[in-house]
Amino acid sequence: MLQRSLGVNGRKLAMSARSAKRERKNASTAASKCYVVPPSARGWVHAYSVTATSMLNRRKAILDYLQGAVWVLPTFGVAIGLGSGAVLSMIPVKSGTLIDKLMFQGTPGDARGVLIVVSATMITTIGIVFSLTVLSLQIASSQFSVRLLRTFLRDVPNQVVLAIFACTFAYSTGGLHTVGEHRDGGAFIPKVAVTGSLALAFVSIAALIYFLHHLMHSIQIDTIMDKVRLRTLGLVDQLYPESDTADRQVETPPSPPADAVPLLAPHSGYLQTVDVDDIAELAAASRYTALLVTFVGDYVTAGGLLGWCWRRGTAPGAPGSDFPQRCLRHVHIGFERTLQQDIRFGLRQMVDIALRALSPALNDPYTAIQVVHHLSAVESVLASRALPDDVRRDRAGELLFWLPYPSFATYLHVGCAQIRRYGSREPLVLTALLQLLSAVAQNCVDPSRRVAVQTQIALVVRAAQREFADESDRAMVLGAAARATEVVERPGTLAPPPSTFGQVAAAQAAASTIRSADRDG
């Protein structure tokens, strides 16, 4: 009887588990995430879930800070070097063995001299490496963009090389205090420690050579643009994983009720990240709704409006006095923009490189054209993705939290507007923008996005007609605009090859203009 009862109960539990698994799977395929908290367990479930998610978000924030902190890995290197140097100095080596023959052979004075030379050399090398690093930061800020400094600070190879040098210095210093100690009336030579110091010296030489190689490549404009492009595309995949479809339904945020309470910024700064899951779970457990009206990446002033919150249910009302404060704990405002949830910042970094290249001080339009090529890769992916706001609802369909994201037209404007204005005197820059717009239009399935592309094409045409006095320059841009417009107006049309927008098109337009002038003459 007991076994039969256990078997029946086991089958019931298994069926219940399979049913719960199916429910979780169905819920995960819904358009927005759902949060259901039983009333009897609301308190402890909410406390556990929000605490766990907050810890994960806090870990991400700490990890993001540590990746950009230059002192972290060198500090670990110093600690490891001091510890290993002191420990290896206490390891004796039996005289006459094979290991003894491989170890350092010399007097205590020789051992002390080796350790001192290695330590002094590492201090000098660390100073050189720091100087070269600061020089690369200066070049990046003056030649490319000040907003790229964060990318250089997050460069792991530089931090690893500094850690190796710091470890070698600390290791050699840690073994110095044991040289010359007398054991049984004889001088003690830390052969293992001295041999390790020599080995670390050769490792440091290899690290220095690699550092110089890496530094020379890292300050190249192509490497910088590729890093920014890849990081931005990674964020696009994270925020917008689904492809766009022609029958996609666009949700619009609700209007806050009259008794909604404003969510005000606690201090001035850039809206860096929002813990969407935390706020949704908080709203699910408290039966509130929160709506943000500020995009991630926007600058807010202290006391400025971030959003609204109100009570859900049949009898709406203002939330309790502590709900806005609890909600604002999961809205992070900082002194700088980051790429954690802000795609526009990745576009801004690339646009800044183009603007600096188009400035009279540099006058490097080809670099601006390269930036446009990298921007086309990001904008084309954005054109092919569904760009919904981040919405959280419960199983009943009631809104828990709404985080707005910029529209496709906004992303396209960020990538094209300033380059069009500052590059309006260079026809190849404008034709590169038209090449970008034709590639974007090829991936658009939403008619409203095609309208946004057509608007940008019209703005490029107006800039060309206003700025270019030479007929061949104007003809080249207008011809490229006509080809891009054809892609916009005929869905399914492939974008023309790059040769129709670049130097080949420029040469053809110039030759055609000269022939027309000769015939007219």
Swiss-Prot record:
Give the start-end ranges of region Disordered.
Answer: 1-25
Pfam families reported for this sequence: DUF2254 (PF10011)
Which keywords annotate this record?
Cell membrane, Membrane, Transmembrane, Transmembrane helix
Predominant location of this chain? membrane
Highest taxon of the lineage: Bacteria
Q: Which GO terms describe its cellular component?
A: cytosol; plasma membrane
Q: Which residues cross the membrane?
A: 68-88, 114-134, 160-180, 192-212, 290-310, 399-419
InterPro entries documented for this protein: DUF2254_membrane
Tell me which stretches of the chain form a coiled coil: none
| Entry keyword Membrane | yes
Q: Topology versus the membrane, per the UniProt entry?
A: Multi-pass membrane protein
Q: Where in the cell is it found?
A: Cell membrane
What's the protein here called? Uncharacterized protein Rv1290c
According to its UniProt entry, this protein's organism is Mycobacterium tuberculosis (strain ATCC 25618 / H37Rv)
Its taxonomic placement starts with: Bacteria, Bacillati, Actinomycetota, Actinomycetes, Mycobacteriales
